[in-house]
């Protein structure tokens, strides 16, 4: 972006200057509305989410057999919700900032099959595509026991079709493993940030991995191009897919059930704050949509991004969405948080969700490494760097009197609050890689 344009952007949006300087930045969204007002802009409804629930239930018998690690849960791919009181104390001590309310962790980092939040959307979209093909071919009815998809006849049928996706790692992992298990031929286009172990794991499942020297945007574009030339190839579009988004949104009702089980209340007097790491936006966008449908105006969602990849904060704050990239303002999009190394946000998610999100913030790689170490020490939970992005949120919210006043939170409401950090990945990180992460924390 030439200087004159850049200066006028900063004059209009002074916060951009902090982003350019790679400062850890928090922006509380002044444009947040009620669910009733914001919902029409999403273009999806509660019914769409119910359909996704139903589809995952139909596939449960199949998943229970195809992936024995899901059998105990009856073929439902869900993660634990745990309190992390020792980490809460550690954060308060390190930042000299009390966190009122209770701190919880949602362990999508340990989801079965692929060990990340992408096991929600990625697996769901592969299943939805497989179902559509099998129904159209007359091989399946909605009433069938879907475990029949494991038969050689189905394997043979699906092998005529292929799937392609562009990914920084975790989405590729979930789509690759699921597609290969069903019988699709699958190609994952991996950006330069992708970890070597993720590529190796995919190849061990018989997935074709194409590597790029460039970032996420290039990998997605190349994947899209490769798929266009083959009518039997289905491209899973992380930037624009409504299906992926709905796969994530199912988490809202599931979390509501977990809260009920644990006797946790969410209402006007007991607000829920949720902190979601954000890459291109599909995962956190879908989850936030599901949370809003489940908890209404009593849930407050925040997106967290690396200082080197603040694409969603930049897009929503300036209103330019996918018309601007972090590279346009001179930011390099290089971060240890490989899952969040995205320079241009999803225009679909930004426009759909901007009224339903309370805020956005950035944090440095070093902050993520530090918190990764603290969580391992205090709670014995090991995550990958990007999964810690949400952990900086509670202290930002508790420190901002202006945000609390904007939403009219009383001291008592904040004392009764639940702060939920969404841990997005790390359950499958190899030991020696994890030790390298731990060594970088202070």
Curated annotation (Swiss-Prot):
TM region(s), chain numbering: none
UniProt keyword annotations, A-Z: Lyase, Pyridoxal phosphate
Entries under Gene3D superfamilies matching the protein: 3.40.50.1100
Reaction it catalyzes: D-serine = pyruvate + NH4(+)
EC number(s) given by UniProt: 4.3.1.18
Cofactor(s) needed: pyridoxal 5'-phosphate
PROSITE patterns: DEHYDRATASE_SER_THR
N6-(pyridoxal phosphate)lysine PTM positions: 118
BP terms from Gene Ontology: D-serine catabolic process; isoleucine biosynthetic process
Record Pfam families: PALP
First-tier enzyme category under EC: lyase
Family listed: Belongs to the serine/threonine dehydratase family. DsdA subfamily.
Oligomer status and interactors: Monomer.
Protein name per UniProt: D-serine dehydratase
């Amino acid at each position: 972006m030439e200087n004159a344009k850049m200066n006028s952007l900063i004059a209009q949006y002074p916060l951009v200057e902090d982003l350019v300087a790679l400062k850890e930045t928090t922006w509380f969204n002044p444009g947040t509305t009620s669910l009733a007002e914001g919902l029409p802009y999403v273009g999806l409804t509660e019914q769409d989410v119910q359909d996704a629930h139903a589809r995952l239930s139909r596939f449960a018998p199949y998943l229970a057999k195809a992936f024995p690690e899901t059998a105990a849960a009856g073929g439902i791919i869900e993660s634990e919700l745990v309190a992390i009181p020792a980490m809460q104390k550690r954060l308060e001590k390190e930042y000299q900032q009390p966190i009122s309310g209770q701190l919880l962790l949602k362990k999508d980092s340990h989801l079965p099959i692929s060990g990340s939040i992408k096991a929600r959307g990625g697996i769901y979209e592969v299943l939805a595509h497989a179902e559509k093909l099998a129904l159209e071919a007359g091989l399946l009815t909605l009433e069938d026991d879907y475990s029949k998809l494991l038969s050689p006849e189905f394997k043979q049928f699906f092998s005529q079709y292929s799937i392609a996706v562009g990914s920084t790692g975790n989405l590729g992992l979930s789509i690759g493993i699921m597609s290969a298990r069903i019988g699709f031929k699958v190609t994952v286009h991996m950006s330069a940030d992708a970890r070597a172990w993720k590529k190796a794991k995919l190849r061990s499942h018989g997935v074709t991995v194409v590597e790029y020297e460039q970032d996420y945007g290039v990998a997605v574009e190349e994947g899209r191009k490769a798929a266009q030339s083959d009518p039997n190839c289905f491209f899973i579009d992380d930037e624009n897919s409504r299906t992926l988004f709905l796969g994530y949104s199912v988490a809202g009702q599931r979390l509501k059930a977990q809260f009920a089980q644990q006797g946790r209340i969410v209402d006007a007097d007991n607000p829920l704050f949720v902190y979601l790491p954000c890459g291109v936006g599909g995962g956190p966008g879908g989850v936030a949509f599901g949370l809003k449908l489940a908890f209404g105006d009593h849930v407050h969602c925040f997106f967290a991004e690396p200082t080197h990849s603040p694409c969603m904060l930049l897009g929503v704050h300036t209103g330019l969405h996918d018309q601007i990239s972090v590279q346009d303002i001179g930011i390099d999009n290089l971060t240890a948080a490989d899952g969040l190394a995205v320079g241009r946000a999803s225009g679909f998610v930004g426009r759909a969700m901007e009224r339903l999100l309370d805020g956005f913030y950035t944090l440095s790689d070093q902050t993520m490494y530090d918190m990764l170490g603290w969580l391992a020490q205090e709670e014995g939970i090991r995550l990958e760097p990007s999964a810690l992005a949400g952990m900086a949120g509670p202290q930002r919210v508790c420190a901002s009197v202006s945000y609390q006043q904007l939403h009219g939170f009383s001291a008592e409401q904040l004392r009764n609050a639940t702060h939920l950090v969404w841990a997005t990945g790390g359950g499958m990180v190899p030991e020696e890689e994890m030790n390298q992460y731990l060594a970088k924390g202070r």
